[in-house]
């Protein structure tokens, strides 16, 4: 049972809100260059 308590304690200490916010910022940050790349590849025709 000791290892399970350790895992539960580890998961309860993780701040999932910060992880979600950083994930969203990364997705938004990647979306900009992706749009520019698509515009360049398709010669401006989205």
Swiss-Prot record:
Record's GO cellular component terms: photosystem II; plasma membrane-derived thylakoid membrane
Topology within the bilayer: Single-pass membrane protein
Recorded superkingdom: Bacteria
Family the UniProt entry places it in: Belongs to the Psb30/Ycf12 family.
Subunit architecture: PSII is composed of 1 copy each of membrane proteins PsbA, PsbB, PsbC, PsbD, PsbE, PsbF, PsbH, PsbI, PsbJ, PsbK, PsbL, PsbM, PsbT, PsbX, PsbY, PsbZ, Psb30/Ycf12, peripheral proteins PsbO, CyanoQ (PsbQ), PsbU, PsbV and a large number of cofactors. It forms dimeric complexes. Part of a photosystem II (PSII) assembly intermediate complex PSII-I; crystallized from a strain deleted of psbJ, it forms monomeric PSII before addition of the oxygen evolving complex. PSII-I includes 3 assembly factors not found in mature PSII (Psb27, Psb28 and Psb34).
Protein name (Swiss-Prot/TrEMBL): Photosystem II reaction center protein Psb30
Functional note: A core subunit of photosystem II (PSII). PSII is a light-driven water plastoquinone oxidoreductase, using light energy to abstract electrons from H(2)O, generating a proton gradient subsequently used for ATP formation. Helps stabilize PSII.
Keyword annotations from UniProtKB, A to Z: Formylation, Membrane, Photosynthesis, Photosystem II, Thylakoid, Transmembrane, Transmembrane helix
Record NCBIfam families: PRK13686.1 (NF010239)
Disulfide bonds: none
GN (gene name): psb30
Segments crossing the lipid bilayer: 21-38
Pfam families, alphabetized: PSII_Ycf12
Residue intervals annotated with topology Lumenal: 1-20
């Amino acid at each position: 049972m000791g290892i399970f308590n350790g895992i539960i304690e580890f998961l309860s200490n993780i701040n999932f809100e910060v992880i979600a916010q950083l994930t969203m910022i990364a997705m938004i940050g990647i979306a900009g260059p992706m749009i520019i790349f698509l515009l360049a590849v398709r010669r401006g025709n989205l």
